[in-house]
Structure formats: C-alpha cells, structure tokens
A protein has these predicted regions:
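Structural motif
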Residues: 9, 40, 64, 89, ...
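Conserved, mostly hydrophobic/aromatic
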Residues: 17, 61, 116, 141, ...
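Conserved anion-binding
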Residues: 56-57, 67-153
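Single conserved hydrophobic/aromatic residue that forms the stacking wall/gate
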Residues: 1-11
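Catalytic cores of alpha/beta
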Residues: 55-63, 101-112, 160-176
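Glycine-rich, proline-tolerant flexible connector loops at the mouths of alpha/beta enzymes
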Residues: 15-31, 121-127
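Alpha-helix-loop-beta-strand connector modules within alpha/beta enzyme cores
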Residues: 27-47, 85-94, 134-151, 196-206
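Glycine-rich phosphate-binding active-site loops on the catalytic face of alpha/beta enzymes
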Residues: 71-77, 120-128, 171-192
Length: 206
C-alpha cells in the first residue's frame, strides 16, 4: 500500500524492498524477481536497496525495470557517484537514512536526489512500531526544501498505520509506504485506511 500526495495517476507505485542478509538481517529477492514482476505490471517500481554494497547492484535493477532506485547512506561507497549513475540511466534516484542517522548527513545530496526516504523503523523486518522522532528530521529537510526551492519528494517507510497519516503530512511527507499494518486489515479496514489517505489529500494507493 503506497499513498502519494498530489502526484497523479502516474505515481501509482509498488515499493519493493531488496534485502541482502548483511546490511539488514533479512533476505528478500533480487533483480530477476523485479524483472518478472515488470512483465505483468505497469506500476511505478520504487526499488529500495537495503544492501551493504548497493552501488554494485544498480545496473541489474535498472535492467530489471526499476523506475526509481533508492540507496542507503550508511554503507561506505561513493554515494554521489551512485546517484549520478542511476540518473544517467534515465530513472529517478533516492537516498535513504535509518532512524539513528542525522538529517544533516543528507545535506550534500539535496540538489542531486529525486527522493529522500526516511525509515521510521529499523530496517529488515515488518511489524515494528513507528518511530515518531524521525518526523522531526523529515520536517527539517522539508523546511530546507521549501527555502531552497528544491524538487525532491519525501517518503517514509516502516510501521505506518492510519493514525500516522496526519503527523506525516504535517512533517511535509509526500509518500507513505504501509505494508504489515495494511495487509493485516480486513476488507473494511483497508477501505478505512484508504479513506483516511483520501481525506488527507493523499491519492493513488496500491
């Protein structure tokens, strides 16, 4: 389930978490699965690389059909070069920070990125509690975005449920990703979740 504010039909998104069992303890899937999904889907593929060496896997996910690739700031590699490589392929790039990573670490990349993703849980497993303190970082970056007239989007991922929608909007968040909370709901509960997004001017859900 992905809600995005004011982005129109083009931004019906599928958020895909790629985990390597090293940077995060869990293991998911690779570019072949993304390629297989692409054959039967026209959704916007928002590919989140939770990898120790994400720069080594950019090309395979570009070839698999990603529309956006986001990479974590925490591992050591040339972040700016990796972001430029993604952009050079004609797709969108993003940079991600974990809950404990300070917002100011994003400053060198604000003019280079299409998206900033704030993890609102420690990445790797679903079902964790939303960390509200992260929203102060999102707000800080949103204020810089407005002051400098920058165009990147702000996304949050992790522990998102209906009670967080208003707080996220107030922090300047454009895109919310909800997994465990949404899929645990019955049909009526999912409709209620979607209605909350609609009433808060968030549109286009998956």
């Amino acid at each position: 389930f992905v809600g995005s504010r004011g982005l129109g039909d083009v931004y019906k998104r599928q958020h895909l978490d790629i985990m390597d069992g090293h940077f995060v303890p869990n293991l998911s899937f690779g570019p072949q699965t993304v390629s297989d999904l692409r054959k039967s889907s026209s959704l916007f593929f928002d590919v989140h690389l939770m990898l120790q060496q994400p720069d080594r896997y950019i090309d395979p996910f570009i070839e698999a059909g990603a529309d956006l690739i986001s990479i974590h700031l925490e591992p050591e590699y040339d972040h700016s070069r990796a972001l430029a490589k993604i952009s050079a392929a004609g797709i969108q790039n993003g940079i991600v920070i974990n809950p404990d990573t300070p917002a100011h670490s994003l400053l060198p990349y604000l003019e280079q990125v299409d998206l900033i993703l704030f993890m609102t849980v420690n990445p790797g497993f679903g079902g964790q509690k939303f960390i509200y303190e992260v929203l102060s970082k999102a707000k800080e970056i949103d204020e810089i975005r407005k002051k400098e007239n920058l165009n990147f989007l702000i996304e949050v991922d992790g522990g998102v449920n209906p009670e967080h929608v208003k707080s996220c909007l107030n922090a300047g968040v454009d895109i919310l990703v909800a997994g465990t909370a949404y899929y645990k709901l019955d049909k009526l509960g999912r409709k209620h979740f979607a209605d909350l997004f609609e009433n808060a001017y968030l549109k286009d859900f998956l």
